[in-house]
Regions:
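Conserved N-terminal phosphate-binding loop of PLP-dependent enzymes in the Aspartate aminotransferase
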Residues: 1-412
Length: 412
């Protein structure tokens, strides 16, 4: 069957059918899928981090079905019961103290909301971002994104700190290098509105920031009157063992908290919902009509998000997620492979760096699909695994066995 979408994706040579029959006997969400030819795969992509519960968790499915029978969409001027409940739970969990929320649909939308509120609240025009960063592909977000291939075709619309083509300008520092951030503050001074950081870089290759670095960003922003925003789109919503990756790395002291944090991906358990949370004193700088979203926080999405947060609590999924990286370290140590340079990450955000010149991991997406495992490859060097939070030792051993076979093929 011909794929008639724009050629913006490296489309896999298969058509997915659904969750694999018999692979979820306890009814807690499935880590395996089948295609229309009946082939089974362990899904280590998970919609790129969107499936914390796995596929077809019965309680999540039931919550969506029940809400679909009531009301699916309402204009944002009409609050709904699931939206109110979802927002209450979200703000209880978010690292941002005394938060107020803007609801959207996708990660890049929540990042755009963060850009708008940072510029509006500070009346400044420079945002500091980082090398290897990924924040989305809409124009504001792509200005923050470090990948030149994504950004450069649109540079005339984006601007740089001394090219006044745009109202927002991006200065880029080195990730986990506080001195490089200090130099940008020295250069741009009171023009700096905010620093945007991923506590764990995902697209950039699964790189966690250090506690000292994140606390240093907090200090610099305090000293210069800038806002600190954390992009929790991929690393947040429980994936690292706490609701926010910031909390996993830094802790939960309110004085260290960021001013803003934004979420998507895992937040809806597989249904699109996103949120940008800002401190109340920052959020008050927005006014009626200053931002909006037709579908943001719609009843279906809110029901999905609410069910996801409730299931995470009921099934202790944050604790389960936290166990994944140490478990994988043990498994790889038992049966190492010479092509593995490093296993790193945080919680259920797993990266396996492959040794070799150039982009040694690039062929592994196709090779591992033939082995019955879906992965993504970051920067040509690192395999990224974003499994359901409850993926246990058995599933991780299965993943590693398939990866070892793939590495043997790569090395042949």
């Amino acid at each position: 069957m011909q794929d008639l979408r724009w050629p913006t994706y490296a489309v896999r040579d298969l058509v997915l059918e659904g969750a694999a029959p018999g692979r979820d006997p306890e009814g807690r969400g499935c880590a395996y899928v089948v295609d229309t030819d009946g082939n089974e795969y362990l899904d280590g992509v998970g919609g790129i981090g969107c499936l914390p519960l796995g596929h077809a968790h019965p309680k999540w499915v039931a919550a969506l079905a029940e809400q679909a029978g009531k009301i699916a969409v309402a204009a944002a001027t009409f609050p709904t019961a699931p939206q109110r409940q979802f927002v209450d739970l979200l703000l209880e969990r978010s690292v941002v103290p005394d938060g107020r929320v803007f609801l959207a649909n996708t990660g890049t939308e929540s990042n755009e909301a963060a850009i708008k509120i940072a510029l509006r609240a500070t009346k400044r025009d420079v945002i500091i971002g980082f090398e290897r960063a990924f924040h989305g592909r809409t124009l504001g977000s792509i200005a923050m994104t470090a990948t030149a291939a994504y950004r450069d075709p649109y540079v005339s619309c984006l601007g740089e700190p001394d090219e006044r083509f745009a109202r927002m300008n991006v200065a880029r520092a080195v990730f986990d290098d506080l001195e490089s951030v200090e130099k940008l503050f020295e250069e741009y001074g009171e023009r700096v509105a905010a620093v945007f950081v991923e506590p764990v870089q995902g697209e950039g290759g699964i790189h966690p920031a250090s506690k000292a670095f994140l606390l240093g960003l907090r200090r610099l922003c305090n000293e210069h009157g800038a806002l600190l925003g954390t992009d929790e789109i991929q690393c947040g919503s429980g994936r690292t063992g706490n609701f926010d990756a910031w909390t996993t790395i830094v802790g939960d002291d309110p004085k260290d908290a960021p001013d803003m944090a934004w979420y998507a991906k895992a937040l809806g358990g597989g249904f699109p919902i996103a949120a940008c949370v800002a401190k109340a004193g920052i959020a008050e700088h927005m006014s009626k009509g200053s931002h909006g979203s037709t579908f943001g926080g719609n009843p279906l999405a809110s029901a999905a998000g609410l069910a996801t947060l409730q299931i995470m609590d009921e099934e202790n999924l944050f604790d389960a997620a936290a166990d994944q990286l140490p478990t994988l370290h043990e498994i790889v140590a038992e049966r190492p492979h010479r092509r593995v340079a490093e296993v790193r990450g945080l919680g259920a955000m797993l990266g396996i760096e492959i040794s070799g010149e150039g982009e040694p991991a690039a062929p592994l997406g196709d090779i591992l699909q033939d082995e019955g495992l879906f992965v993504t490859v970051c920067k040509g060097k690192t395999l990224r695994l974003l499994l359901p939070y409850r993926a246990d030792e058995t599933i991780l051993r299965d993943a590693w066995a398939r990866i070892r076979r793939g590495l043997d093929k790569l090395s042949a």
